[in-house]
Amino acid sequence: IRPLAGEKGIALTVCHVNHGLRGETADRDEAFVREVCARLGLPLRVFHAAELEAEAGKPRAGEDWARRLRYACFERVLADGIDAVATAHTGSDQAETLLFRLARGTGLHGAAGIRPSRPGYLRPLLCLTRADTEAVCRACGERWVTDETNDADDYARNRLRHGALPALCGVNSAAERNLARFCEKAAKADEYFARQADALLASARAADAKSLPGGAGYALRSGQPVWMSEPLRQTDPLILDMALHSLVEPVRDAEEKYIRLLADLVEKGSGAVQLTDAVRFCARDGVLWREEADKNIRRQGEKADCPKF
């Protein structure tokens, strides 16, 4: 990336996050990054967990917190004027992500895996496997360090990395690349169906609170979206799945079970699906709507249409 950045007139800054969870080896990794950046003449910003408690919470073991911490650091870098953050995700990470999501339950959106870019973020190494990046380092005479937690099978991703992926590569040595290529195709299909799903939700939106049952009317008046159920029921099931995914994703991980629960709610036409302590979707009298515990305030004396939070 460094020679390419020079050709394109792009200034590089390295960002390293010390999670503080691995003691001496975490400090070793930080020292390694500092040495490499000093030798290559690259500016470096180092973050420690204590600096980011407000954004990421107190340090604790687990992939979710570590990822939240990293992206809190990246957001600070972006806020300081960096144009984009380039992460080091490879095609091997892409293959692991696909297998992990398929095992947990996912649809086309999840099968698209890690996107090559999104606002503020680039993933320039998705076209390479982990073995490719190591080969490049060897060719350039560069060393690397390995996070020892990647060698343990405590995490599901590591078990896939050490078990499922090698087994697949035993069937076809290009398995990692083929899985990553499938993600690219799934992403293109996902984008097309997402446009169809957006059009469906737009056409099904209700606009007049007076014609809606109580709970839906309260939702609409408080700024929550309301949809007529019939257009949703009549659409192609794949388009409906995509539409429901777009409703779940802003609230929580859009696992397949939540999509199925909402699809059943649309089909039955009455009831409620609780996504979190504060957010649920309700259906009654031909409409579907979203409720939030602190926004759907009923007028005094009016009855709720769905069970209380």
Region annotations inferred by a language model:
Residues L4, V36, G91, A167, ...:
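Histidine kinase transmitter module recognition
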Residues I1-P166:
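Core alpha/beta nucleotide-donor-binding catalytic domains of modification enzymes
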Residues A5, T13-H19, A49, L69, ...:
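AMP-forming adenylation/ATP pyrophosphatase catalytic core
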Residues D27, A56, D154, N158, ...:
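Non-catalytic, surface-exposed connector residues within folded enzymatic/regulatory domains
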Residues R104, L108, R130, C169-S173, ...:
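Alpha-helix boundary/capping and short turn/kink residues
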Residues C140-R177, R181-E184, K188, A283, ...:
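Mid-to-C-terminal catalytic subdomains of enzymes
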Residues T97, H109-G110, L126, C169, ...:
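Short secondary-structure boundary micro-motifs
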